């Protein structure tokens, strides 16, 4: 399985082409639209989300509600493009129109300046448009297809926010996977403690009035993954490493950890390692899950626990100082439409990116020309693991 995305933030559309999806997977536009709608939700989103109502168009690889095994083409139209016809025109236009929305004051923390240097852009909009988080629309769309595969194999997942702009979420003890999932899904903030909703919303409103932004830490949990996915035999076969790369590829993500993560640096080995158990009904298990479901780059059969940290959005309504790329004089950075926070949306993106990596690993590990073939191979493997 592999995919490519294309498109700009204010261009005509966003596109993804996915190759390697088994034939016979039940797939409807509504499956993808559901995930796209989740990405657009959450408290703190800005005006762009009131303009766009993302709906996918499937133009290849699916017939009569089933995948055919051919490449799948997904497209989402940018409604906002109608206001940017001259600025984002494909053909050449008058110089005065080119200057209309030219970006020459790069934003600290964004790809504007370095992108312009790398690709020799006189107008930093050429970097801004593609580096925008709008691109993650298609990564969510691809992830929605991946989640359909995982669902057919009995794998489920959730995300929730652990730290929201410096506020630590108090997680009630002994919540089951399903309880965590339901609480997060029904929260505008993707948190599992409803008692903290108003406190955080008030803080977001305050940050918005200040023209500032906030980030936080998101946790994704995956249930139902058997032991043995990934490999220790080469560095690039380690599944946790693949997940780390994928999570860090999400716009504004600056760190990733598994299980208790960086807290391991403060603990002893006897406190960190997960003791092994075995029962006739369940096979091998662990007393704890400090390592987040991974040993030696392979899954252990425990829930996968992946955490990612998102920096505050770099576009500020009270912009920081920058430099004019023409005169090299100090200037305030360009202001583009932005949000005080996009943490709930980032959680949806992270969840779908993780789903894509896991689906790819499964498709590469098991015979998967068709879904029935994959389901049998996966079921046989589960049975083997249980009786090892």
Curated annotation (Swiss-Prot):
Protein's name according to its UniProt entry? Chorismate synthase
Q: Which cofactor does it need?
A: FMNH2
Pfam families under this entry? Chorismate_synt
Task: Note the superkingdom of the native organism.
Answer: Bacteria
UniProt remark on cofactor binding: Reduced FMN (FMNH(2)).
Subunit comment: Homotetramer.
Question: What does the record list as GO biological process?
Answer: amino acid biosynthetic process; aromatic amino acid family biosynthetic process; chorismate biosynthetic process
Q: Write out the entry's keywords from A to Z.
A: Amino-acid biosynthesis, Aromatic amino acid biosynthesis, FAD, Flavoprotein, FMN, Lyase, NADP
**For this protein, what reaction is catalysed?**
5-O-(1-carboxyvinyl)-3-phosphoshikimate = chorismate + phosphate
Q: Which SUPFAM superfamilies match?
A: Chorismate synthase, AroC
UniProt xrefs under InterPro entries: Chorismate_synth, Chorismate_synth_AroC_sf, Chorismate_synthase_CS
Specify which residues bind NADP(+) according to the UniProt entry for this protein: 39, 45
Family, per entry: Belongs to the chorismate synthase family.
GO terms for cellular component = cytosol
Task: Identify the residues that bind FMN.
Answer: 130-132, 251-252, 296, 311-315, 337
Recorded GO molecular functions are:
chorismate synthase activity; FMN binding
The role this protein plays is: This reaction introduces a second double bond into the aromatic ring system.
Q: Where does this protein act, in terms of pathway?
A: Metabolic intermediate biosynthesis; chorismate biosynthesis; chorismate from D-erythrose 4-phosphate and phosphoenolpyruvate: step 7/7
Query: Might you give the EC number(s) for this enzyme?
Result: 4.2.3.5
């Amino acid at each position: 399985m592999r995919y490519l995305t294309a498109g700009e933030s204010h261009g005509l559309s966003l596109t993804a082409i996915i190759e390697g999806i088994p034939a016979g997977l039940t797939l409807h536009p509504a499956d993808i639209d559901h995930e796209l709608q989740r990405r657009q939700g959450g408290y703190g989103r800005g005006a762009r989300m009131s303009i766009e109502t993302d709906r996918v168009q499937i133009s290849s690889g699916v017939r009569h509600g089933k995948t055919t095994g051919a490449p799948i083409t997904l497209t989402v139209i940018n409604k906002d493009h109608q206001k940017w016809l001259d600025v984002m025109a494909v053909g050449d236009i008058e110089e005065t129109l080119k200057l209309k929305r030219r970006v020459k004051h790069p934003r600290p923390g964004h790809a504007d300046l370095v992108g312009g240097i790398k690709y020799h852009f006189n107008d930093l909009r050429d970097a801004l448009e593609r580096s925008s988080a709008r691109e993650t629309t298609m990564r969510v769309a691809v992830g929605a297809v991946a989640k359909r595969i995982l669902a057919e194999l009995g794998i489920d997942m959730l995300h929730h926010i652990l730290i929201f702009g410096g506020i630590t979420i108090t997680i009630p003890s002994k919540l089951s996977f399903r309880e965590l999932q339901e609480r997060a899904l029904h929260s505008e903030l993707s948190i599992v403690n409803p008692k903290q909703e108003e406190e955080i919303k008030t803080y977001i409103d305050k940050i918005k009035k200040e023209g500032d932004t906030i980030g936080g830490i998101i946790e994704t949990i995956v249930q139902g993954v058997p032991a043995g996915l990934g490999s220790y035999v080469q560095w690039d076969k380690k599944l946790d490493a693949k997940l780390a790369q994928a999570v860090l590829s999400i716009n504004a993500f600056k760190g990733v950890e598994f299980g208790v993560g960086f807290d391991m640096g403060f603990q002893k080995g006897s406190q960190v390692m997960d003791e092994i158990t075995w029962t006739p009904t369940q096979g091998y298990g662990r007393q704890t899950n400090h390592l987040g479901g991974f040993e030696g780059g392979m899954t252990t059969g425990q829930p996968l626990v992946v955490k990612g940290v998102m920096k505050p959005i770099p576009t500020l309504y009270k912009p920081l100082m920058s430099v004019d790329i023409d005169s090299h004089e100090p200037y305030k950075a360009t202001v583009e439409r932005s949000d005080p926070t996009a943490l709930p949306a980032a959680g949806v993106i992270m969840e779908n990116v993780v789903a894509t990596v896991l689906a790819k690993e499964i498709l590469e590990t098991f015979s998967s020309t068709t879904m029935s073939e994959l389901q049998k191979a996966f079921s046989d493997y589960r049975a083997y693991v249980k009786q090892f």
